[in-house]
From Swiss-Prot:
The keyword Cytoplasm does not apply. It comes from Methylococcus capsulatus (strain ATCC 33009 / NCIMB 11132 / Bath). This is Putative membrane protein insertion efficiency factor. GO terms for cellular component: plasma membrane. HAMAP family: UPF0161_YidD. It is found in: Cell inner membrane. Could be involved in insertion of integral membrane proteins into the membrane. The keyword Transmembrane does not apply. The lineage of its organism: Bacteria, Pseudomonadati, Pseudomonadota, Gammaproteobacteria, Methylococcales.
Length: 75
């Protein structure tokens, strides 16, 4: 499952992202964040972190540097 999700994200990065433009307000970009989170924490926890990140990605959020956490703790 982890490999499948990372492959889908890479396909998005190479096929769709160039057409949509690079407008991510965060560093690393949301797709790079997703690959890192899934690679570190697996499909389920990585997807959870990615969904939380995508919910913050909107015009009213200032953005900035938002790395994947080193370890998951109580939040």
């Amino acid at each position: 499952m982890q490999r499948l999700l990372i492959t889908l994200i890479r396909l998005y990065q190479y096929l769709l992202s160039p057409w949509l433009g690079h407008h991510c307000r965060f560093f690393p970009t949301c797709s790079n964040y997703a690959m890192d989170a899934i690679g570190r924490f697996g499909a389920m926890r990585g997807a959870y972190l990615t969904i939380r990140r995508l919910m913050r990605c909107h015009p009213w959020h200032p953005g900035g540097i938002d790395p994947v956490p080193e370890k998951l703790g109580k939040q």
